[in-house]
Swiss-Prot record:
The gene is clpX. This is ATP-dependent Clp protease ATP-binding subunit ClpX. The keyword Lyase does not apply. Gene3D superfamilies: 1.10.8.60, ClpX chaperone, C4-type zinc finger domain (6.20.220.10), P-loop containing nucleotide triphosphate hydrolases (3.40.50.300). Pfam families: AAA_2 (PF07724), ClpB_D2-small (PF10431), zf-C4_ClpX (PF06689).
Length: 422
């Protein structure tokens, strides 16, 4: 319906789709016989955009262009343009290698595995998860912290290939064209500078085990996982065409890079810039293979990851965008929770910037945003279900800083204000 009947609200207009009145939404667009609000328009755009995603990453010859892949990544991941470009080109080249695999050619295209390095909460895992949504090759994510050498308690490296097989419905042909993302790769660094001090089954041992499957080998994969079923037949999977992307925070790597870059100059020409003033992401841009060796990765493992991409720290503007822009942005999530209580939730611009600055101070990146939001809204979410007539809750900078309570706007206040203005 477009208009209500009877009473003082005789001339009030309503959205024909969701039923909200003109006072509950920012904009109401009129058609010949219907009305639609800005929220319904935004929802329709999200649905169309989601359906359009799969067609964006396919071109005429089946190989998506780097620009198409980047365009989709931009919808989900804020900032990190360099890392997104590296991933877009790598995935594009991976598709091209697969399209050339069956053709006779003098030149064999070798794969270029990727290493993503960046501070915690900057979007490494989100980039991988977004790729998984948009690609039409099998994709799996593995956690390096659970891996151990074969024969020890924990997961074998073959379990990574098993997950890829499961993602391809046990189609070996499709699994051999897949992409694997290994998270927390920095956690398998060598635990000691002396390689012979003791057997390192979850550090250097895992690096050694990963070498062959990353370069290309025929791996024997138990279809039921583990070694508990000795009678089962093993599946043979060729890993030559599987692209490996590794990611890690590499905490402390920035100190190794800074130490390498320090000179012993003194006097008037010396650089007296405080190394602490440089942000982690800025320091990581100068990473060299020798820094990774000092961190604890073995030379052979570093050699299997020729493409190196570093991610930047998220600045204030990027964190504000993360709060509001993506489809599943935090602010939208909490607004949906408040809508279930028939209440609108709104944040002032200064409040969003204050939340972003708090997250930067905590050095937890985007991951710190949720805990800050929970702290701000805890009392409100506790009290709201027992309150009646609350139409809107407004959060400003003072609320984020803990100097004030959120502003509650009641429906009777808004009605009286409308009457006064009339």
């Amino acid at each position: 319906m477009s208009k209500s009947s009877g009473g003082d609200s005789k001339n009030t207009l309503y959205c024909s789709f969701c039923g909200k009145s003109q006072h509950e939404v920012r904009k109401l667009i009129a058609g010949p016989t219907v009305f639609i609000c800005d929220e319904c328009v935004e929802l329709c755009m999200d649905i169309i955009r989601e359906e359009h995603k799969t067609s964006l990453v396919k071109s005429r010859d089946g190989v998506p262009s780097p620009k198409d892949i980047l365009k989709v990544l931009d919808d989900y991941v804020i900032g990190q343009q360099h890392a997104k470009k590296v991933l877009s080109v790598a995935v594009h080249n991976h598709y091209k290698r697969l399209s050339q695999a069956g053709k006779n050619s003098d030149v064999e295209l070798a794969k270029s595995n990727i290493l993503l390095i960046g501070p915690t909460g900057c979007g490494k895992t989100l980039l991988a998860q977004t790729l998984a949504r948009i690609l039409d090759v099998p994709f799996t994510m593995a956690d390096a912290t659970t891996l151990t050498e074969a024969g020890y308690v924990g997961e074998d490296v073959e379990n990574i290939i098993l997950k890829l097989l499961q993602a391809s419905d046990y189609n070996v042909e499709r699994a051999q064209r897949g992409i694997v993302y290994i998270d927390e790769i920095d956690k398998i660094s060598r635990k000691s500078d002396n390689p012979s001090i003791t057997r390192d089954v979850s550090g250097e041992g895992v690096q050694q085990a990963l070498l062959k499957i990353m370069e290309g080998t025929v791996a024997s994969v138990p279809p039921q996982g583990g070694r508990k079923h000795p009678q089962q037949e093993f599946l043979q999977v060729d890993t030559t065409n599987i692209l490996f992307i590794c990611g890690g925070a590499f905490a402390g790597l920035d100190r190794i890079i800074s130490a390498r870059g320090k000179g012993s100059s003194i006097g008037f020409g010396a650089d007296v810039r405080d190394p602490e003033a440089r942000r982690t992401g800025e320091v990581l841009r100068a990473v060299e293979p020798e820094d990774l060796l000092k961190y604890g990765l073995i030379p052979e493992f570093v050699g299997r990851l020729p493409v190196l991409a570093t991610l930047d720290d998220l600045d204030e503007d990027a964190l504000v965008d993360i709060l509001t822009t993506p489809k599943n942005a935090l602010v939208k999530q909490y607004q949906r929770l408040f809508e279930m209580e028939s209440t609108q939730l709104s944040f002032k611009e200064d409040a969003l910037r204050c939340i972003a600055l708090k997250a930067i101070a905590r050095k937890t990146g985007a991951r710190g945003l949720r805990s800050i939001m929970e702290g701000i809204l805890l009392d409100t979410m506790f009290d709201l279900p027992g309150m009646e007539g609350v139409e809107e809750v407004v959060v400003n900078k003072e609320v984020v800083e803990g100097r004030a309570k959120p502003l509650f706007i009641y429906s009777d206040q808004r009605t009286s204000a409308d009457g006064a203005s009339a």
